[in-house]
């Protein structure tokens, strides 16, 4: 099974979008929009569909950057995390999967964070990629 998560970053504020989950497995944990890639879907197609479902739209973006690919030890599960650079923060139209949202500054992690996202943001290689993204798309303030 493949799944995808999208971490939106606003150029004008430098902040990242997090969603407050409303599910059985990780209720009340902060995570990213995303989910399972359906049979026959590409990663990009699944990402766009999940954003349409969970945010109400797929915002126009400047760039889409692969951040991490997690593969389970049995190779049965892959999770692809992408950073999606947008010009401005937007107000998502949340579906039943989420209770709220927050745009937060880099390094200010919401708590509790979904364990998969927590693992991702604590990898040194991911932190280096995030720093490179932030240098490339610095805040326009």
Residue locations for each model-derived region?
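Unchanged
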Residues: 35-126, 140
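Conserved N-terminal beta-strand and adjoining loop/helix that marks the start
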Residues: 1-17
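C-terminal lobe/hinge of AMP-binding adenylation domains
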Residues: 20-21
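A conserved beta-turn-beta hairpin within the catalytic core of GNAT-like acetyltransferases
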Residues: 25-28
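Short intrinsically disordered terminal tails
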Residues: 135-141
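A short gly/proline-enriched turn/hairpin at secondary-structure junctions
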Residues: 31-32
């Amino acid at each position: 099974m493949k799944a995808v998560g999208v971490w939106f970053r606003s150029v004008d504020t430098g902040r990242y979008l997090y969603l407050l989950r409303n599910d059985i497995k990780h209720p009340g944990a902060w995570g990213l929009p995303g989910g399972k890639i359906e049979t026959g879907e590409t990663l990009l197609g699944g990402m766009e569909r999940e954003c349409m479902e969970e945010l109400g739209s797929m915002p126009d973006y400047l760039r889409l950057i692969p951040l991490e690919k997690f593969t389970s030890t049995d190779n049965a599960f892959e999770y692809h995390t992408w950073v999606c650079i947008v010009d401005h923060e937007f107000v998502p139209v949340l579906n039943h999967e989420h209770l709220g949202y927050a745009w937060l500054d880099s390094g200010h992690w919401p708590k509790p964070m979904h364990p998969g996202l927590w693992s991702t943001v604590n990898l040194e290689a991911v932190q280096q990629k995030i720093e490179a993204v932030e240098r490339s798309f610095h805040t326009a303030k």
